[in-house]
């Protein structure tokens, strides 16, 4: 019975087919997908932090409120960028649905990683020349395995 279930691609009693984490082609494609997500998230995230750091300096917002808004804006700009990229391949409303559904977990983990690095290294929502690279590295590496897994398991990607 277990063999019949696992041969159909499902799990039973903790048994499942071995998952291959060593597929170089999938790692490359998932890295490309992660890169586009990182570009979109970074635009909104860095833009929000920079706006509060350089323009709205006396806003009264706490660093945590700024970071929450930066995460939200990062996700929104990533969805907008991914929708624009996908709209070349499909209808705009379908591209929007795919952009939201396929990459939300990736974007949330990316934004959380970037803002945690910012908080740990600068003590708040601050952009300095030396914090941007660690934020981008953390933002890329955190969701990359998930993007690989999703692409490998479901052959599903955002781009």
Regions found by a protein language model. Give the residues of each.
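A cytosolic-side transmembrane-helix exit/cap motif
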Residues: 83-90, 147-155
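Transmembrane alpha-helical segments of multi-pass membrane transport proteins and ion-pumping complexes
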Residues: 41-50, 74-83, 107-115, 139-144, ...
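Helix-boundary and loop/linker segments of multi-pass membrane transporters
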Residues: 18-24, 60, 88, 92, ...
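Juxtamembrane helix-capping/reentrant segments at transmembrane boundaries
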Residues: 90-106
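C-terminal halves and exits of single transmembrane alpha-helices
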Residues: 101-123
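Helix-coil boundary and interhelical linker segments in multi-pass alpha-helical membrane proteins
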Residues: 50-65, 120-130
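Alpha-helical transmembrane segments
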Residues: 62-74, 131-139
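Flexible metal-binding regulatory segments at protein termini and peripheral loops
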Residues: 1-36, 41, 144, 148-149, ...
């Amino acid at each position: 019975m277990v063999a019949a279930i696992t041969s159909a691609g499902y799990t039973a009693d903790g048994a499942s087919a071995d998952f291959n984490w060593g597929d170089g082609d999938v790692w490359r494609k998932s890295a490309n997908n992660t890169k586009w997500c990182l570009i979109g998230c970074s635009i909104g995230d860095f833009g929000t932090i920079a706006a509060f750091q350089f323009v709205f300096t006396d806003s009264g917002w706490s660093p945590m409120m700024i970071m929450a808004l930066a995460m939200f804006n990062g996700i929104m700009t990533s969805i907008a960028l991914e929708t624009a990229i996908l709209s070349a391949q499909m209808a705009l409303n379908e591209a929007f649905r795919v952009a939201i559904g396929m990459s939300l977990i990736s974007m949330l983990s990316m934004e959380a990683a970037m803002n945690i690095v910012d908080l740990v290294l600068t003590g708040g929502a601050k952009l300095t020349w030396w914090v941007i690279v660690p934020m981008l590295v953390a933002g890329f590496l955190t969701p990359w395995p998930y993007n690989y897994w999703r692409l490998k398991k479901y052959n599903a990607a955002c781009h």
